[in-house]
Amino acid sequence: MQQQALSTKQFDAVCLQAASLSDEIEAGRRLPAEFARQLAAQGMFSMFVPRDLGGHELSPVDGMARLEKLAQYDAASAWVCMIGATAALGSAFIKADIAQPMFAAENRITCGIFAPNGRGYRDGDDYVVSGRWAWASGSANADYIGLGCLLTENPDDDPKTAEMRLVMAPRELIQFHDTWHTLGLKGTSSGDVELSQARIPVAHSYAIGKDLPWHDGPLYQMPYFAFLAAGVGAVALGNARAAIEDFKRFVGVKKGAGERRTLAEKSGVQSQLAQAEVTLRATRLLYRDTLAGIWQDVCAGVEMTPEKRADLRLVSTHAVRQSVAVVRIIHDLAGGTSVYLSSPIQRRLRDAETMTQHMIASASTYELVGRVMLGGYHETMQL
């Protein structure tokens, strides 16, 4: 049965709740379990699950807009939903009768890590898998976690013959390590997870970029890695917007030491704020225009060439890295107020800086895209 569509009123209420819980989320280094299930009930983890399974099958444009807005209220909540929702694209690549309870059961939460840190081999109808993965965002509340693995047919096969697949591991098979003590995105429970000789049914796995979806909707023709990058970009843009709005709320009353004028009355502050604003708006426009163009092409059946996939990776990384530049300006303008852990602007900066360290939005993306622009594409590129 298809989940009820999330109304604007319901979504606004979820956003306000995220804001009210932001300090608790930060201190606890995870989303409270009850709140995570509320997000799931409102469809934040099933945005990109096929309607045939009970998901919402939102367009990338609509889904990323929701993540961007949620990030304005609490970046950690948006990050967890982003990782979970993009990981749930796998629901269209696993047989429907298996995927439905895995991805679309009531209040289901999933997350995923595509880094192929697992090793395993086939034993009958199962893969036997061991490995350890970092950055397992949302793992504190996840029912299933997609884990990247290099898998062979036999234990002694040459590793060069291994196939990269994501295995959907149920929570009860996973060992959780409390490693997420970080600069930012503290509330995302992105600690390490581990499997040790775990048996995962072959039917509970899929290969990104190789397996064909059982669902013929255009959403499942979107390039996975570029789609993930777009998700990170959406969260970064929302976080940067919130930093500007946070600053505008207090700049009219704050005065520097020994000064009569408020920060809002200073021409230098006015100029830098305007520059931050136009930087963010221009970056967001490029991001949304490119995402909408890619989606339009996918819906029209246009081939997703390496150049098109690289373009979405490029503008998404640009969104992340320009967003942190904007937040740095705001943090600097806020002065001494922003050094305190209680400062929302400081949290925005710490969260923004941490987003830049995710490999999908790192500076190495520019090298990757430049290589494609110069005709150097090869199939192992994560586009």
How does the language model describe each region?
Residues 41-103:
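Internal helix-loop-helix
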Residues 183-280:
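Glycine-rich beta->alpha junctions and the first turn(s) of the following alpha-helix
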Residues 334-383:
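Glycine-rich phosphate/cofactor-binding loops in nucleotide/flavin-utilizing enzymes
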Residues 19, 23-26, 281-318, 328-339:
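C-terminal helix-coil-helix/basic helical segment that borders enzyme active sites and/or dimer interfaces
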Residues 238, 274-281, 313, 317-324, ...:
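Generic structural signal for well-ordered, non-transmembrane alpha-helical segments
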Residues 132-173:
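DPxDG-like acidic metal-binding loop motif
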Residues 112-113, 149, 169-182:
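Active-site glycine-rich loop that binds ribose-phosphate moieties when present
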Residues 88-125:
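Well-ordered mid-protein domain cores that form the structural environment of catalytic cofactors
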